[in-house]
């Protein structure tokens, strides 16, 4: 009997949030007797799956340069994608699991022209909105709704993936035709929030399911041995990238308002950002050291996530698993991670609301045990990612 084969495609492998999700899905598949491959564009950590590198640095730089001028993200890297397709035909996967196929490493037109001719089952997890727009990965920052009918004159032309010329109308039509033509496509949404958008997009007639992301509860757990100064209330913020959309400016403003009784730590800053942080804001560069992150989550009295554009942030789940309550903006699927016993939702951009929530959290702390219980009930990676494998088994 042929061993079932899973091939996942993502920009990273076991690196960053989507890369770690792919790694966990691969591990779960292997535990159920599957052979697992992960094809990736750049940045990886060691993996239990077979890794396939797509292209090289020159491919990436050429893709980036062409996209910056012509607005054709995902339509370059032709040679690299042809080589990937050759490998796909050799390993003959039963399921191709897509994650982020944008970010300068893959040609989605070539990939889908190939997949659409095969009987391979395709499962695509929506980590952002790029799949069903003509350009952007998150349209909520501009309140744009053109993606519901036909993208044109993109108001986010200067945002990722930034470009000189606007061809959002052509991109939208091409995506609609290519992705819509695949009769073996199943859509996974990480949150109810993004699922509702998919149901309004040109993918609305596809099978759409919601599977929340999960975290490793054996890794992300409270470090009880930590000794903290309880005279100082610890506020933590973590992100892979810090920019305006992630709430970096709001973090700076928050630091100006809070007194010295509150210590703020921000993880994931660049060297340049680190050197420009105001006094009283502790900066830590992006780290792949999980134990360091666990220690920071466990030390914190509250975790804040002032994001303006997000789907279902893994950092919220990691904080809860470490017993730390979450304060988040009402953005995307971020509020779905918490309930009234484990966090507070603040209206987007309301820095004073963040301050008030932090004050309340200090005066009347939420239960660390309740945070952990919610993580165990809803976001155990083994339970969450097992749902992917159950789906694969049904599809084949």
Give residue spans per PLM region.
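Short alpha-helical donor nucleotide-sugar binding micro-motif in glycosyltransferases
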Residues: 295-300
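A short, well-ordered alpha-helix in the C-terminal region of glycosyltransferases
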Residues: 5, 366-390, 394
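Conserved acidic donor-binding segment of nucleotide-sugar-dependent glycosyltransferases
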Residues: 340-351, 359-365
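Aromatic "clamp/platform" in nucleotide-sugar-dependent glycosyltransferases that forms part
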Residues: 308
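Short hydrophobic beta-strand element within catalytic cores of glycosyltransferases
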Residues: 325-328
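Nucleotide-activated donor-binding/catalytic signature segment of Leloir-type glycosyltransferases, i.e.
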Residues: 268-294
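Carbohydrate-associated surface elements
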Residues: 193, 214
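Conserved donor-binding/catalytic core segment of Leloir-type glycosyltransferases
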Residues: 188, 227-246, 252-256
């Amino acid at each position: 009997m042929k061993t079932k084969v899973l091939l996942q495609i993502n920009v990273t492998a076991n690196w960053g949030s989507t890369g770690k999700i792919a790694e966990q899905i691969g591990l779960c598949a292997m535990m159920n007797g599957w052979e697992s491959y992960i094809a990736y564009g750049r940045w990886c950590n060691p993996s239990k799956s077979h890794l396939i590198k797509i292209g090289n640095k020159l491919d990436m730089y050429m893709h980036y340069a062409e996209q910056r001028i012509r607005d054709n993200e995902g339509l370059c890297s032709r040679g690299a994608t042809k080589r990937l397709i050759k490998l796909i035909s050799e390993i003959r996967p039963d399921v191709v699991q897509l994650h982020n196929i944008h970010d300068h490493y893959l040609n989605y037109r070539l990939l889908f022209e190939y997949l659409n001719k095969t009987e391979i089952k395709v499962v695509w997890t929506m980590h952002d909105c790029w799949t069903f727009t003509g350009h952007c990965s998150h349209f909520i920052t501009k309140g744009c709704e053109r993606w519901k009918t036909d993208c044109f004159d993109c108001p986010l032309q200067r945002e990722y993936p930034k470009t000189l010329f606007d061809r959002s109308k052509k991109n939208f039509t091409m995506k609609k035709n290519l992705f819509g033509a695949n009769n073996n496509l199943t859509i996974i949404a990480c949150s109810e929030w993004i699922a509702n958008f998919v149901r309004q997009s040109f993918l609305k007639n596809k099978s759409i399911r919601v599977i929340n992301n999960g975290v490793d509860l054996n890794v992300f757990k409270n470090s009880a041995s930590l000794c903290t100064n309880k005279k100082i209330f610890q506020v933590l913020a973590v992100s892979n990238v810090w920019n305006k959309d992630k709430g970096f400016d709001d973090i700076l403003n928050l630091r100006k308002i809070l007194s010295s009784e509150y210590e703020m730590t921000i993880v994931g800053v660049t060297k340049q950002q680190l050197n420009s942080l105001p006094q009283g804001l502790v900066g830590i560069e992006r780290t792949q050291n999980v134990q360091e992150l666990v220690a920071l989550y466990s030390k914190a009295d509250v975790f804040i996530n002032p994001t303006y554009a997000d789907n279902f942030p893994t950092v919220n789940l990691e904080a809860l698993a470490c017993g730390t309550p979450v304060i988040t903006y009402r953005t995307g699927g971020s509020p779905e991670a918490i309930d009234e016993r484990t966090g507070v939702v603040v209206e987007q951009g309301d820095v004073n609301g963040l301050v008030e929530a932090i004050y309340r959290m200090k005066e009347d702390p939420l239960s660390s045990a309740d945070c952990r219980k919610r993580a165990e009930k809803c976001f155990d990676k083994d339970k969450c990612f097992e749902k992917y494998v159950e789906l694969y088994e049904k599809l084949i």
